[in-house]
């Protein structure tokens, strides 16, 4: 098992609506979300640093440093995503939980990007290159940078690998973008209070 520093081990997982093309950029909400998965198996991995601009829950502008992880293709087993909306009138906090990818049919994503703030996982990378100029990763095994209005330095630090396997994944993220995202066995639930995936 190869353990790479946290920026290298960032898992590209999350829940998002299926999209036909990659969004260049968007303002992130004032809420990060948590994701867990038993396993992620991906091909064509790339990663680099960026800034996500967005808002607080009070509407003030803010920004978040993130590690953007990208996969050309990824299969995710037993995925859970949770987000908590705090301080709603009368009822207080409400938790939204989404689960998918169980019963032998993993979640499948193509051209997947996830903007991650924190990650815990065991990770194994195959044929990894660390220290690649981020803008040059478009010529590597992964999808490279998003482009568009993204706030990232194409001459900055990047890394790429032919494949990656991550197990026992726990992460906090601000955004996910995917070309396609198939959520097998999707179940959504709402509950009062704080009930997160971890």
Task: Give, region by region, the residue ranges found by the protein language model.
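N-terminal export and membrane-targeting signals
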Residues: 1-8
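Extended, solvent-exposed, non-transmembrane regions
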Residues: 10-198
């Amino acid at each position: 098992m190869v353990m790479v520093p946290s920026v290298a081990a960032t898992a590209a997982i999350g829940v998002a609506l299926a999209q036909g093309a990659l969004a260049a950029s968007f303002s992130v909400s004032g809420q990060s979300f948590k994701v867990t998965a038993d396993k992620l198996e991906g091909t064509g991995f790339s990663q680099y640093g960026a800034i996500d601009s967005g808002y607080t829950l009070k509407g003030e502008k803010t920004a978040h440093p993130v590690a953007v992880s990208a996969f050309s293709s990824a299969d995710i087993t037993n995925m859970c995503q949770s987000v908590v909306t705090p301080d709603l009138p009368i009822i207080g906090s409400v938790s939204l939980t989404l689960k998918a990818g169980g019963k032998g049919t993993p979640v499948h994503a193509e051209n997947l990007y996830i903007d991650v703030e924190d990650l815990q996982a065991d990770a194994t990378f195959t044929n990894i290159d660390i220290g690649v100029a981020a803008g040059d990763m478009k010529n590597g095994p992964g999808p490279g940078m998003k482009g568009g209005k993204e706030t990232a330095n194409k001459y900055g630090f990047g890394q790429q690998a032919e494949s990656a396997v991550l197990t026992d994944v726990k992460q906090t993220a601000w955004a996910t973008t995917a070309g396609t995202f198939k959520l097998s066995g999707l179940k959504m639930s709402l509950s009062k209070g704080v009930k997160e995936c971890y």
